[in-house]
Amino acid sequence: MSERLTDNPSLFRLRVRYGKRDRLKYLGHLEVIHTIERIVRRAGLPYAVTQGFSPHMRVGFSSALPVGTSSTCEWYDLFMTEFVALDEAFGRLAAASPADLAPIEAAYIDVRTPALTAQLTRLSYRIDLHLDPEAPVSADEVHRAIDTLRAGHGIDYARGKKSKRLDLDHTLVGYE
């Protein structure tokens, strides 16, 4: 099936970076997918559909973001059947998007480019600490706490009935 899509000379691939902020950070990944599909339909872009028994919009997403996490660097690839000028496509997507899920940038890429999930192999998080002004904590204390966590090489935690171990040797590669 992917060969049919990549061999099609009239197929265009628009890579869009978008943000997931404020109220919409509480949407799950499937809800984000459905919302983006509605945005594309409202924008009137000529999207491609998959082949097969149950055709659906040909769009690929980066890895799922944890529910409740804001981001300004989420991605999706939209396959289109007709070329639309980049400024026009971006403007139509922006006009059809809610502010908390708006596109930040877009670019056409080669249709044969590997999927986003194959390209994005690392995630980077920024944590903003909102500390109590009555009990100030210095940056050195925060760094020492992280170093203590790393010295144990992991954190055991329970999620539901399963207990897991988060490997911090690979998770906390660098921090400021």
Question: Which residue ranges define each predicted feature?
Answer:
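Charged, low-complexity intrinsically disordered regulatory segments in eukaryotic signaling
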Residues: 1-8
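Short, flexible turn/loop "capping" segments at secondary-structure junctions
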Residues: 8-9, 68-72, 118-120
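Extended, well-folded interaction surfaces typified by the phenylalanyl-tRNA synthetase beta subunit core
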Residues: 11-12, 17-19, 23, 27, ...
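Short glycine-/aliphatic-rich beta-strand segments at the starts of folded cytosolic domains
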Residues: 13-20, 76-78, 121-130
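Ordered, soluble secondary-structure elements with a strong preference for glycine-centered loop motifs
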Residues: 25-30, 47-48, 83, 87-88, ...
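Short, charge-patterned binding micro-sites
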Residues: 48-81
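Internal, well-folded beta-alpha domain core
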Residues: 86-176
